[in-house]
Curated annotation (Swiss-Prot):
Residues annotated to bind L-serine: T231, A232, E233, E285, S385
Lineage: Bacteria, Bacillati, Bacillota, Bacilli, Bacillales
Binding positions for ATP per the UniProt entry: R262, S263, E264, E349, I350, S351, S352
Functional pathway: Aminoacyl-tRNA biosynthesis; selenocysteinyl-tRNA(Sec) biosynthesis; L-seryl-tRNA(Sec) from L-serine and tRNA(Sec): step 1/1
GO MF assignments: ATP binding; catalytic activity, acting on a protein; serine-tRNA ligase activity; transferase activity
Biological role stated in the UniProt entry: Catalyzes the attachment of serine to tRNA(Ser). Is also able to aminoacylate tRNA(Sec) with serine, to form the misacylated tRNA L-seryl-tRNA(Sec), which will be further converted into selenocysteinyl-tRNA(Sec).
InterPro entries, per the entry: aa-tRNA-synt_IIb (IPR002314), aa-tRNA-synth_II (IPR006195), aa-tRNA-synth_II/BPL/LPL (IPR045864), Ser-tRNA-ligase_type_1 (IPR002317), Ser-tRNA-synth_1_N (IPR015866), SerRS_1_N_sf (IPR042103), SerRS_core (IPR033729), tRNA-bd_arm (IPR010978)
Organism, as annotated: Bacillus licheniformis (strain ATCC 14580 / DSM 13 / JCM 2505 / CCUG 7422 / NBRC 12200 / NCIMB 9375 / NCTC 10341 / NRRL NRS-1264 / Gibson 46)
One GO CC annotation: cytoplasm
Pfam families linked to this entry: Seryl_tRNA_N (PF02403), tRNA-synt_2b (PF00587)
Subunit relationships: Homodimer. The tRNA molecule binds across the dimer.
Full protein name: Serine--tRNA ligase
EC id: 6.1.1.11
Biological process annotations from GO: selenocysteine biosynthetic process; seryl-tRNA aminoacylation
Enzyme kind, highest EC tier: ligase
Length: 425
């Protein structure tokens, strides 16, 4: 959520910046009208309350003098009715204004490239050499089928499309990867490990920006107003909702492993095979609460920490700076880390690292004090995938595949795989 005072003072400038996102700003245009009306109603209500207090004092004075005050009592009742009507009108206006504020996306940071689609994203850097094969590289689902480590067909029978069973060394590989990721982030970078709830309430989904705009993309529990989490970002960010932290506590860094649940409502026909786009998948999420002046330095740190996973696994990747049209609703700046997928001859997203500035903190009411009696300020929140585990499995199977159908296990992962160095058919 944006700062109302900032929006009021810089309406046209902010509107121009948001226009670069390419989103519908029809609701945004109503802000000025409703905000003006709200302030006018508040003035009227306060004036009438002042008048009512004045008349009340006059009534009391007349009664002390044992004089007739019926005409003033009648006037006071009429003023009370007027206040009641204006209060109802004010509540309606404020409700409409709140809906608009929740629908306005974040302002892109000045360093974000202006563009409309993913084609306008800017490559920041690349790492690693692309593998060379003496044979036609297979897609990871064919490799996994030959190794008997993933079962999409039976998952389709048990649940439906975009689900998978991990089996045998496939399950061991998945577990090895998220344990390896957690150990790196906790032991090397000092994150606090958290296991979050996999269901959250409406306030939590609103706090991080999934609601109300993207409710149709979420899995909702029918009997309760709960949602399956699309990412651990939601419960971990809301861990400090409605709290005032002290400056001494910042930065706060959490690393969380969780299952994630996504409807993929807008992805019909895309990535229908394999692990790239599943309704349920595992992810290690990194979440930061920082002072505003530190947030962009922390974004670089966060991105580098996510990159380190791929470097240790020796998987080639590139880092992309997302343009304004591909930034997402909540981020002020976002980097995507894309890993090389040989069978597709392209890079695919495996992590997004974002700085939300105060956007989520304002929605979730997360603040801090620089001094014990200082005025509370909103923290800046950041998060990034460290990494999406299923996509890492896909990248590993494809980049380390051998002509005989086996897959070499990266050296960094072998201690987590019982010191195996290869998965054989």
């Amino acid at each position: 959520m944006l700062d109302v005072k900032l929006l009021r003072a810089n309406f046209e400038e902010i509107k121009q910046k948001l226009a670069h996102r390419g989103e519908d700003l029809s609701d945004f245009d109503q802000f000025e009208e409703l905000d003006t009306k709200r302030r006018e109603l508040i003035v009227k209500v306060e004036e009438l309350k002042g008048k009512r207090n004045e008349v009340s004092q006059q009534v009391a004075a007349l009664k002390r003098e044992k004089k007739d005050a019926d005409h003033l009592i009648k006037e006071m009742r009429e003023v009370g009715e007027d206040i009641k009507k204006l209060d109802e009108e004010l509540r309606t206006v404020e409700s409409s204004l709140d809906k608009i504020m929740l629908s306005i996306p974040n302002i892109p940071h000045e360093s974000v490239p202006v563009g409309e689609t993913e084609d306008d994203n800017v490559e920041v850097r690349k790492w690693g050499e692309l593998p060379e094969f003496s044979f036609e590289p297979k897609p990871h689902w064919d490799i996994a089928d030959q190794l008997d480590i993933l079962d999409f067909e039976r998952a389709g029978k048990v649940t439906g499309s975009r689900f998978v069973f991990y089996k045998g060394l496939g399950a061991r590989l998945e577990r090895a990867l998220y344990n390896f990721m957690l150990d790196l982030h906790v032991d090397e970078y000092g994150y606090t490990e958290v296991i979050p709830p996999y269901m959250v309430n409406r306030a939590s989904m609103t706090g991080t920006g999934q609601l109300p705009k993207f409710e149709e993309d979420a899995f909702k529990i029918r009997e309760e107003d709960y949602f399956l989490i699309p990412t651990a970002e939601v419960p971990i960010t809301n861990l400090h909702r409605d709290e005032i932290l002290s400056a001494d506590e910042l930065p706060i860094n959490y690393a969380a492993f969780s299952a994630c649940f996504r409807s993929e409502a807008g992805s019909a026909g895309r990535d229908t095979r394999g692990l790239i786009r599943q309704h349920q998948f595992n992810k290690v999420e990194l979440v930061k609460f920082v002072k505003p002046e530190d947030s962009y330095e922390e974004l670089e740190k966060l991105t580098n920490q996510a990159e380190k996973v791929l470097q240790l696994l020796e998987l080639p990747y590139r880092v992309m700076s997302m343009c304004t049209g591909d930034l997402g609703f909540t981020a002020a700046k976002k980097y995507d880390i894309e890993v090389w997928i040989p069978s597709q001859n392209t890079y695919r997203e495996i992590s997004s690292c974002s700085n939300f500035e105060a956007f989520q903190a304002r929605r979730a009411n997360i603040r801090f004090r620089r001094e014990a009696k200082g005025k509370p300020e909103h923290v800046h929140t950041l998060n990034g995938s460290g990494l999406a585990v299923g996509r890492t499995v896909a990248a590993l199977l494809e980049n380390y595949q051998q002509e005989d159908g086996s897959v070499i296990i990266p050296k960094a992962l072998r201690p987590y795989m019982g010191n195996r160095d290869v998965i054989q058919p």
